[in-house]
């Protein structure tokens, strides 16, 4: 059966050159080298509306290029602004895909989504062409009931920009840090305060069920000695 599915996908690519095709994750069954070469993107997981999807997406940086990792941002009317921020930042870990009931949400939520999409446009080249330099999900001991902090960092192809993601599940308020020697904070998105002192980038998370933040850092120019 699987061999026939592979033949079918290959036939589609041959018959329709340039086709942008998503390979369904099928519970992760298709996260293998054969299927990853057949489509333009592979859905990262079936955890579309689960908060634990952020941990799954981070861990998949070990085996997939994020430019091929389609991540659903499923936006629902019952979600709080905190949950919407969390969902949008989760999707920014890979190739963002909006879903849910966007026609039924409040103007506040639509504003968060629009701002998130605009922010993603400014970082997508790092997602597409960069290199992941930090994967940290060690605090998370259960995907079904995650608790703790997860981090991800990815640098641009030229090494001049650094993208830092942080997610917190049900922890007291705390500061989450990233090594950032020689970098300054250029922008951030999320429901968390962010800063960078030239040595560390920091984001304050926690104190609520879900919180998340993403920061874009840029390397400072060293002054040339006369």
Language model segments and positions:
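Glycan-recognition surfaces
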Residues: 2-104
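Conserved active-site loop/cleft motifs that coordinate metal ions or position small ligands
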Residues: 20-22, 163-166, 185-186
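Short, glycine-/Ser/Thr-/acidic-enriched flexible segments
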Residues: 28, 169-171, 190
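Catalytic cores of secreted or luminal carbohydrate-active enzymes
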Residues: 88-137
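Carbohydrate-binding surface patches
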Residues: 140-182, 212-216
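Short, exposed beta-strand/loop patches in secreted or surface proteins that constitute
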Residues: 151-155, 192-198
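Solvent-exposed beta-hairpin/edge-strand motifs
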Residues: 179-191
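C-terminal beta-strand-rich structural cap/linker in extracellular carbohydrate-active enzymes
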Residues: 196-226
């Amino acid at each position: 059966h699987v061999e026939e599915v592979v033949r079918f996908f290959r036939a589609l690519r041959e018959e329709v050159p340039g086709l942008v095709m998503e390979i369904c994750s099928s519970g992760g069954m298709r996260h293998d080298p054969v299927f990853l070469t057949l489509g333009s993107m592979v859905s990262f997981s079936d955890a579309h509306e689960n908060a634990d999807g952020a941990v799954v997406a981070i861990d998949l940086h070990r085996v997939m290029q994020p430019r091929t990792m389609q991540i659903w941002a499923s936006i629902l009317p019952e979600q709080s602004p905190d949950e919407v921020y969390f969902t949008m930042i989760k999707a920014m870990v890979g190739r963002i895909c909006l879903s849910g009931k966007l026609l039924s949400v409040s103007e506040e939520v639509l504003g968060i989504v629009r701002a998130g999409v605009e922010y993603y446009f400014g970082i997508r080249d790092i997602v597409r062409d960069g290199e992941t330099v930090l994967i940290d999900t060690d605090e998370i001991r259960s995907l079904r009931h995650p608790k703790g902090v997860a981090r991800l960092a990815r640098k641009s192809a030229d090494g001049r920009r650094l993208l830092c993601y942080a997610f917190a599940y049900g922890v007291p308020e705390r500061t989450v840090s990233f090594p950032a020697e020689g970098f300054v904070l250029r922008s951030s998105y999320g429901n968390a305060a962010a800063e960078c002192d030239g040595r560390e980038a920091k984001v304050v998370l926690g104190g609520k069920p879900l919180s998340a933040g993403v920061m874009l850092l840029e390397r400072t120019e060293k002054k040339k000695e006369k």
